[in-house]
Every structure is written in structure tokens, then in C-alpha cells.
């Protein structure tokens, strides 16, 4: 169980990092078997409560009561799974049951109690039951079984004494370790920490994930075009792969065949890689904003909450853009990094922030481009920065008034993505551009000159053709 902290202890934050495992085939088989044993514990609890329900008894859902039943089973009941890992499954079941009961009492009829079997269940070990030394992890096993030592793909980014728990998870056919640690708040020197009187407005967007209007006429714009290109190229690449394997893909009657399993595994790997790339790009963009705010000594970030944008029904294409945008993930990344830096984050309604002039407070037609121009007072500037200024003005907690930025810093999010740099080339873009050229769309490939008919004096067909333009 997690330890209890004294009331007067310094404040800490809980952060997690996912580390891949470099296990041998024998170690991988033991790790997968541990996850299967966790699923067996989950199934036993379901069967136990089903039996009690048939007898008319109350369900057994308390964590301590479930642990007593586990102790009666004895060691070695679930293979190599030790009691600490099995108790983590019981904790997961108990939390899920009480969460569903709470939602039911609140009037949510769609909340369901745990009822389905799960083949693989994540296992968690708390501090004191495992050991991490460099890139080596030692996991406990059942009595009279050799412990499991696994090599990590990289060193854990936290000191060993700060690690509170490790969780063994499986995603897209790969094994990972989620490490949770206690991280202290960032320490700043005298006169260098965040100033609560300095405030900045943050506007969330699709083209530009973050547009920040700070004090002193400073502004920051983080571009997300590389992330949008990653989503578009991933979609085009997935469609191209499906077309390529359509002829050799297994039919519906061959479900479970070797070819079917390989096809599904390849799809899961591609989807998981796409999600990892976008997740890292979101964290990099949020880190850019927080680093900029720390340099400017901003103590409060007023973030526009686009909840109104998600409620409307604007059609299938707009809903798809919003799903790809994922504003909740952007807000979570920004909040976590700002909290670790000691910066307060406040969410306000952003409705109408990009169509209101921050100078004369008049509503204007929302510009279709990136340029905002007020027909009443003549104010002009970046549309997203105008929204950030209006968002900062909606906070009622005090602070300096944020004006229209005069010095704008531009940063690009997702610089690690394939094809984001000038000297790098995404192989998917080459395949996608050639497909577009075959359809006849831009950029078009120049056709070879036609031979003039015999006896004709025209020399148009002999003119040299320029090289076709290349997509950036």
C-alpha cells in the first residue's frame, strides 16, 4: 500500500514514466504468464461473487476481505504470481466496483460493475517489494520460485529512493513498465521563481496548439502543423497498407489463422507507434510553453477551455477534427508540467475570445485566416494571440492586465516527427505524393513530350521540361 505522508511534509507530485523492457524469450514468457495469472485472479473474484449472488449473499468487494480470501488460497495458487502482485489486482477490482456504485448513486444508469473476464491484467508492486539498479529490475515471484530480473531499455528518469511503485503492462503486443515516483516541486532561486502577480493567457487551437499572451508585450505561438501532418500521413499510410494487403488479406472465415494474427499485430504496432509519436509531441509542446512561462516569471496561466466547441453537432468531418485534436490531452499535459514548475493554472470559458477586439471590446466577424483586424478601432494581430489576450482578461483573480503582444516567439511542436526537419524525409510522404500525382492532383508530375507528327514543323514537343516541384 502507498505510504502515508505527514501533514507538515513538503509537497510532492506523483509523476509516471513508461519504460520498455528488454527481456529474453524466457523472461518474456514468464512476464506474460504473470499477466495471465493476474487475469486468473480477476476471474476468481468474478466467480466468487457470482456464487455468492446465487446464494443470496452480499458481494465480496472490500479490499481487506478480498485479501483474506487470497490468504486462504495459499502460496503458488496462481503460478509465479506473488501475493503483492495479486493484491494489486484485488485493489483494482475493489476500486472499479466502488466507482461504479458511486456513479450509480449519482444517477448514472450506464455505469456497470466489473463483470467481464480479462485475459491480461496489469500488475503493480509498491516500494519495498522490488528493486531498481541502473537498467536492471528485480520483480518478486511466488515462494520457492526464482526472482525475475529484467533489463530495461533505458534508465528510470527518477532516483531509486523516489520510486513508489512499478506496474507491468502490455500494449500492442509489447511489455512496458510504468514507474510512478514522488517528484518535489521545482526549486527557484530568490527573485527567480514564478510571480503570482504576472499572468498569461493561453488559447488552445488545432493549427497552433498553444498561443500565449504574456506580460510585457511578450507572446508565444507553438505550431502544430507537424502533428497534423503526422495524423494525415498516418491515415494515408494506413489506407495504402490496407489496399496493398487487400489481395492477400485473410477472409472473414479465417479468423484466428496465422496470417490473420500477423495482420492484426502489424496494425496494432503501427497504431501504437502513431499514438506514441503524438503523445511525445504534445508533451514537448507543453514543455515549451511552461519553459517560456518560467523564463518570464509567469505565476498564473489562464487557459481557455474549449468545452463549448465539443458540445455542438457540426457534422462528421468537424467531429473527426475534434477527435484528432484531443483538447483534454493538451490540457492535461499543460497542467501537469505547470504544476511541477509551481505555476497556477486556471480554466475559463473561451467562447467568443477570437471574435472580440481586446482594445474596444466590440464583436467582429471571426476571421477565416490567421490575421485579426478590427473594423472599429483598427487593431490588427495574430488571431490566436487576440484570443489569448481576451482569455487572460476573463480571469477575476487579479493580476497585471495582459496587452496585445508586440514581440512574438514562434516555436514548432513535434520536431522529432519524421519529415519535420529540412534534411529529413518521411518515407510515407514519398508514397503519398506519388499516389496523389497518379490521381492528377498537385504536385503533378510532368508528362513526357509527345512526338510531333511526321512532316510537321512544330517544335513545341521538343521544349525542355522543368523538374517537377517537390513537396516540402
Regions found by a protein language model. Name each.
Residues 1-86, 466, 471:
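Gly/serine-rich nucleotide phosphate-binding loop at the start of the catalytic core
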Residues 6, 15-18, 29, 171-472:
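Positively charged, helix-rich recognition surfaces that bind polyanionic ligands
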Residues 18-20, 149, 165, 199:
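Well-ordered beta-strand positions in beta-sheet-rich domains
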Residues 38, 89-97, 267-274, 331:
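Short amphipathic alpha-helical coiled-coil/interface segments
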Residues 45, 89-100, 385-395:
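Stable alpha-helical structural segments in soluble proteins, enriched in small hydrophobic residues
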Residues 46-53, 97, 101-108, 183:
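Long, hydrophobic, amphipathic alpha-helical segments used as structural scaffolds
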Residues 62-171, 324:
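Acidic carboxylate diad motif detector
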Amino acid at each position: 500500500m502507498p505510504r502515508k505522508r505527514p501533514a507538515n511534509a513538503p509537497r510532492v507530485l506523483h509523476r509516471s514514466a513508461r519504460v520498455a523492457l528488454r527481456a529474453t524469450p524466457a523472461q518474456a514468457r514468464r512476464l506474460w504468464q504473470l499477466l495471465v495469472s493476474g487475469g486468473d485472479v480477476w476471474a476468481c473474484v468474478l466467480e466468487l461473487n457470482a456464487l455468492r449472488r446465487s446464494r443470496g449473499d452480499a458481494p465480496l468487494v472490500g479490499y481487506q476481505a478480498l485479501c483474506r480470501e487470497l490468504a486462504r488460497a495459499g502460496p503458488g495458487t496462481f503460478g509465479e504470481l506473488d501475493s503483492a502482485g495479486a493484491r494489486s489486482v484485488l485493489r483494482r477490482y475493489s476500486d472499479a466496483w466502488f466507482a461504479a456504485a458511486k456513479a450509480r448513486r449519482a444517477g448514472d444508469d450506464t455505469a456497470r460493475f466489473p463483470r467481464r473476464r480479462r485475459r491480461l491484467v496489469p500488475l503493480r508492486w509498491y516500494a519495498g517489494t522490488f528493486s531498481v539498479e541502473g537498467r536492471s529490475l528485480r520483480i518478486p515471484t511466488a515462494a520457492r520460485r526464482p526472482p525475475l530480473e529484467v533489463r530495461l531499455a533505458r534508465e528510470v528518469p527518477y532516483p531509486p529512493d523516489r520510486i513508489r511503485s512499478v506496474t507491468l503492462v502490455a500494449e500492442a503486443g509489447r511489455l512496458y513498465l510504468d514507474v510512478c515516483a514522488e517528484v518535489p516541486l521545482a526549486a527557484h532561486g530568490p527573485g527567480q521563481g514564478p510571480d503570482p502577480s504576472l499572468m498569461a493567457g493561453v488559447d488552445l487551437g488545432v493549427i497552433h496548439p498553444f498561443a500565449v499572451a504574456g506580460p510585457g508585450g511578450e507572446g508565444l505561438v507553438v505550431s502544430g502543423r507537424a502533428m497534423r501532418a503526422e495524423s494525415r500521413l498516418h491515415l494515408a499510410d494506413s489506407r495504402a497498407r490496407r489496399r496493398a494487403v487487400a489481395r492477400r488479406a485473410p477472409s472473414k472465415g479465417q479468423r484466428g489463422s496465422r496470417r490473420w494474427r500477423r495482420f492484426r499485430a502489424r496494425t496494432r504496432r503501427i497504431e501504437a507507434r502513431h499514438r506514441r509519436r503524438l503523445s511525445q509531441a504534445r508533451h514537448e509542446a507543453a514543455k515549451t510553453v511552461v519553459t517560456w512561462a518560467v523564463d518570464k516569471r509567469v505565476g498564473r496561466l489562464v487557459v481557455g477551455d474549449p468545452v463549448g466547441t465539443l458540445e455542438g453537432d457540426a457534422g462528421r468531418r468537424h467531429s473527426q477534427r475534434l477527435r484528432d485534436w484531443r483538447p483534454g490531452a493538451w490540457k492535461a499535459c499543460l497542467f501537469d508540467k505547470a504544476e511541477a514548475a509551481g505555476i497556477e493554472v486556471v480554466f475559463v470559458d473561451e467562447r467568443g475570445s477570437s471574435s472580440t477586439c481586446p482594445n474596444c471590446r466590440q464583436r467582429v466577424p471571426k476571421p477565416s485566416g490567421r490575421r485579426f483586424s478590427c473594423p472599429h478601432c483598427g487593431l490588427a494581430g495574430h488571431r490566436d494571440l487576440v484570443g489569448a489576450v481576451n482569455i487572460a482578461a476573463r480571469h477575476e483573480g487579479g493580476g497585471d492586465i495582459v496587452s496585445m503582444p508586440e514581440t512574438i516567439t514562434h516555436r514548432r511542436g513535434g520536431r522529432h516527427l519524421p519529415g519535420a526537419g529540412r534534411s529529413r524525409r518521411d518515407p510515407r510522404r514519398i508514397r503519398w505524393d506519388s499516389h496523389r500525382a497518379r490521381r492528377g492532383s498537385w504536385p503533378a508530375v510532368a508528362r513526357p513530350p509527345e512526338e510531333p507528327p511526321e512532316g510537321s514543323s512544330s517544335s513545341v514537343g521538343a521544349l525542355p521540361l522543368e523538374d517537377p516541384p517537390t513537396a516540402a
